[in-house]
């Protein structure tokens, strides 16, 4: 009797061993800012292959893109993001303040949870007919400047602060003279799109404006896709070091059971393949080895960090909160 039972047990175990192991299907939602579409299309495919090879599971990553501030508000209002990859730390801080992302999120990954950096450059039309060379040229009469709305766009906030930082560095400058400079700049802005990609469309496809204040990656992408026979990149004398951060949305991944995959997804941005994809899409890799490897791909610009303007909490309150500098100086149609 024992022998028969034992043989039956062995037979069952053999069948179980031969049975196929079914792969799990996991779906992540990456809520990102406006001009990262191409980056994450490439990266999502690479991560899915990596995760399949490592675990056997199938991963589908859905993307949502828009102005960074607008995207942060959508997550706060219930958009069920597994990860956020936004334009600036303040937007993830805002999500964290609502209890969706745990405090200290910026310490979870290397380089303050920013796997890539960028900066702000100028995209002008071929031949640079208005002879725009630096920030000071943007306030000249007759120059039309395209930039998004800093109330909704992270890129626009970087544009604004890069311009402000330049103005503060001029001889005899003060916060008041820097504000005056910004007021003159915005008088030359005919339209404020809600996000960086919309501003690029206005400049490139609609033909509006003499100069686009652009993410460096967006300008380089436009040059690649549309050709140097139509546009040129102008590197200003100084610009801001933009550090777009990433984070797992803790409350959502714990509810959905996707934490392990979501965390691995962000960690893979720091891998060899992740950093190569980042560089291919014209973002500056954060990992030193790849930053050095691709340094010649980018203009040599003196960059200053947001900490020189007090950090994002202070800059947001002073410049972009209701009643802040932007509200005080922006007068549409005047």
Describe the function of each predicted region:
Residues 1-10:
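Bacterial N-terminal signal peptides that target proteins for export
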Residues 19-23:
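Sec/Tat signal peptide C-region and signal peptidase I cleavage site
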Residues 24-153, 295, 330-331:
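N-terminal segment of the mature folded domain
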Residues 31-33, 124-126, 144-171, 186-189, ...:
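Short beta-strand->loop
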Residues 114-119, 179-186, 192-194, 226-259, ...:
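Periplasmic-binding protein-like
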Residues 127-133, 152, 165-173, 252-260:
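Short helix-loop capping/hinge motifs at secondary-structure junctions, enriched
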Residues 170-237:
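Ligand-binding pocket segment of bilobal, Venus flytrap-like solute-binding proteins
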Residues 253-334:
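Extracellular/periplasmic juxtamembrane helices and adjacent flexible linkers that interface
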